[in-house]
Amino acid sequence: MDEQNSTVFQAFEWDIPADQQHWQRLRRVLPQLSSIGVSSLWLPPACKAGNPRGNGYDIYDLYDLGEFEQKGSRSTKWGSKKDLQALASDARRLGLGLIFDAVLNHRCGGDGMERVKVVEIDQDDRRKVVSKPYDVDAWLKFDFPGRHGAYSGMRYGWRQFNATDWDHRTRKNAIFKIIDGGKDWAHDVDKTEHGNADYLLMNNLDYTDKKLQDDVKQWGAWIVRELGLAGFRLDAIQHFSHKFSNEWMTHVQSKSNKPLFFVGEFWSGNVQLLTHWLDASPAGLHLYDAPLLYNLARTSWSKKPDLSSIFDQTLVQARPQNAVTLVMNHDTQYSTHSLT
């Protein structure tokens, strides 16, 4: 993607109807988007969710783009794989890049349960254990039966996860850290959020597992080829292994015949925290300028706004070459939880 004055358009919002027609609607407006100067489209997570109405952040199967009968539907909320490929073809013809929202932190909608030993973790401090070890029945088996091994034969089990949020035996919701096999949180994640940001929600992936690493790297290279992608948005980048996200970007880029664009979602108003993350990442990684968004929000609330300080302590000021500016997205809508 040509980064000179480029404009990435978020091609979805949170409350779009789950009518499986979104790819078709989006395809019809591609010429208009191109004509007004849009460079690339940020697509929602197009992978199969845990239910037909899921937006894809509740991800079930990376390799099912609306092709297989799984979790109550063949298509995703957004549409079928055939419609997505038609959208990608038209976008390429018009010179529009596609940025894919990659949800690599967690999984949802397991196909079966496994009994694992856990400890409960404090909701506000992930370093604090609040129970003795005990067994839970967790939905950690992901067999992807509708896909029948197409594209990948990988199946997930407890070894690919280090935490879950539901014990089916007691019908209890909590943060359960798996301790079988000596498991622990990833240590190369953000430490300013809850003491350790590894756990966010659902079934948390454990990137110390080599099989998991290899499969997710393979998926990244596969989907670039499958859709002719221009790049990726990395969802919740501070919540999973920094080492792995670096390796993943490097691997996917090495398998592509063109430069790819990478932008990470790291919600923090601390610009020093963002620049430190960038310092330990591949040079091509960008981050959303959350500090600028917070400045804009505070200015909009103020009775005496001072626009002369709007760029103070922002990423576009500190690292303009790595900043992606924004004024809102699906996380800042009225129907979602947001600090803005």
Where would I find each of the regions flagged by the language model?
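Aromatic-lined carbohydrate-binding/catalytic grooves of carbohydrate-active enzymes
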Residues: S34-S80, L96
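Solvent-exposed, acidic/flexible segments
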Residues: D19, W23, K77-L84, D209, ...
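Long, low-complexity, polar/charged, intrinsically disordered or flexibly structured peripheral segments
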Residues: A150-K211, R225
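Short loop/turn segments at strand-loop or loop-helix junctions that form parts
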Residues: Q10-W14, P45-A46, V327-N329
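Active-site-proximal helices and loops of the catalytic beta/alpha 8
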Residues: D2-S6, R25-Q32, P52-I59, G66, ...
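N-terminal anchoring/stem segment of glycosyltransferases
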Residues: W23-L26, V38
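Boundary/entry segment of secreted carbohydrate-active catalytic domains
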Residues: M1-Q20, A197-D209
